[in-house]
Amino acid sequence: AFVKGSAQRVAHGY
């Protein structure tokens, strides 16, 4: 998922 969001980045580990 290419979405700019810290929450999603943390969930994916980026």
Curated annotation (Swiss-Prot):
The lineage of its organism: Eukaryota, Metazoa, Spiralia, Lophotrochozoa, Mollusca. One of its GO terms (cellular component) is extracellular region. Expressed by the venom duct. It comes from Conus planorbis. The mature peptide does not contain cysteine residue. Its main location: secreted. It is found in: Secreted. This is Conomap-Vt. One of its GO terms (molecular function) is toxin activity. It comes from the Eukaryota.
